[in-house]
Design a protein with these regions (language model features):
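Structural marker of alpha-solenoid helical repeat scaffolds
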Residues: 48-51, 85, 133
Length: 140
């Protein structure tokens, strides 16, 4: 009677490793183009001193480009600068959560307790920022 409701889980349906978007190997021309884009974005950011919204968007682009190049630490620096300019949910927030988790996992593999604590602390600070954003949106 209930045979059709309870099915066995198919273990073959779930792949063991899901390829990540940023870990694809880039050709030399793609890498060179992305490196040029990083240089151009960095120059634009240095020239903008008063418009935080525009600088925020440029930092987001810089972070995304650094992720494509596989430069996680540089991407983290760009996204942190973006969040510093404008605290909001969005690309920078989501990317930082993912990058912090990746760095924490690498530190755990290397059994480096100091780095694990560093990335956990950064994640906690980002979550605290999300609470501030939520509260500011509702007038608390």
């Amino acid at each position: 009677m209930f045979g059709s409701l309870f099915k066995k889980k198919d273990t073959q349906r779930h792949p063991s490793a899901v390829p990540k978007e940023g870990n694809q190997s880039l050709s030399t021309t793609e890498a060179a183009a992305l490196t040029k884009k990083v240089a151009a974005l960095t120059t634009q950011i240095e020239q903008i001193t008063d418009d935080k919204n525009k600088r925020h968007l440029l930092y987001n682009q810089l972070g995304a480009t650094q992720v494509k190049l596989g430069n996680d630490l540089e991407a983290i620096a760009a996204y942190e600068a973006s969040v510093k300019d404008k605290e909001e949910f969005g690309d920078a927030y989501n990317a930082l959560l993912n990058l912090y988790e990746t760095q924490r996992k690498q530190a755990a593999k290397a059994k480096n307790d100091d780095d694990i604590q560093k990335w956990v602390t950064k994640t906690d600070a980002l979550l605290d920022m999300s609470k501030r954003v939520m509260r500011s949106g509702f007038g608390y």
